[in-house]
């Protein structure tokens, strides 16, 4: 019995020993290979072209240094210029600028550096070619109460008092600015952040809703002087008037030739007109080496008030939600029952979400795809489901220092089968000149923990060599 037990133990020992030796032999025969290093596996960097004060001699020098430092690629973002170098400024997308961009693509290809390009000089999308019709909008409103037999005793008008917000230190008075904003000289020095002109806003619609559930469209009863030619019939009536306003957000940090109004992100024609400027600038040019176009987040509402309207909103709302919002303006403005207010507001926000996805993100991605390129998009901050917006992007990109927020872009990349999810890296550290490489490593570690694979440092400037 004891001998049998001993033999069984020996047999088990020999079996385990044989298995271990076999595994060791397999391990010794298997050579572990490090994955191939490409420019996508290396860190990239945002590359400010300050004032587009770029020369080919500068490009030759610094791009070689970037390659020697093992950077994988450069994301070109033209921004505002440096005082004292105005004589070297070049307008974004001008023929001279395009020639320098083509030279950069050629040099990058020779050095094995990738190149991405921001689809704006600064952010968000916008510029001097954006007309007032294509610029971001806001909606203003007035409400009135009437009883049976009463008439409105004041004109239905809304006057925008106007204001100007500045990103720089040059004093600017609203009265000194021409309209549209693109008509003003030296926008680079003015550094405007938001401009709303003092003016009367155009009327969109006037409706009357009764306590019995009736709804009347009174827009045709408004006289040229704003008088409402209507007497309230039986019941208590709520009069709602909507007016279309100019939101006034300007492109942030814009470089020469990029200053101007931000686009209406909810309008398909606005993004089409905007991107046609790039088509025109690059027509007949070889930009095949360009990898992705880039957008540095939504940030339209980084301003006073929100961009919350587009001229075709009523029609789009009915298409997406299946009913006429014009009949429910009291609920939209939050003065109906709490339940109805909440339901209509939800539908309004969902429609904004749909327009931002379908009229902006998807159209932008399709435009890039027709060129054989993709888009990198920072969707955070958008008035929409950012996960859906990230899903449209070829490379979802995130920023920040909160791990849960960081995971948003990589999570979508994972579920949608996208191989890359990038980050705007090391932007938010300590105060200026108080950060060190240890702080940078800590920031990058957090991105890697959150699922980001390629990182894009923010940022490098282009040294202007005298």
Predicted regions and their residues:
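C-terminal motif of bacterial Sec signal peptides marking the signal peptidase cleavage site
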Residues: 24-25
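Aromatic-lined carbohydrate-recognition surfaces of secreted/lumenal glycan-active proteins
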Residues: 116-122, 294, 357, 361-384
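Substrate-binding cleft/loops of secretory-pathway carbohydrate-active enzymes
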Residues: 124-135, 298, 302-305, 376-402, ...
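Conserved small/polar residues in nucleotide/adenosyl-binding loops
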Residues: 458-464
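Catalytic-core region of carbohydrate-active enzymes that cleave or remodel glycosidic bonds
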Residues: 369, 387-457
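The substrate-binding groove and active-site-proximal loops of carbohydrate-active enzymes
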Residues: 43-54, 83-98, 254-273, 341-358, ...
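Mature extracytoplasmic enzyme cores
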Residues: 30-35, 42, 54, 58-60, ...
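Conserved, mostly hydrophobic/aromatic
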Residues: 47, 108, 293, 368, ...
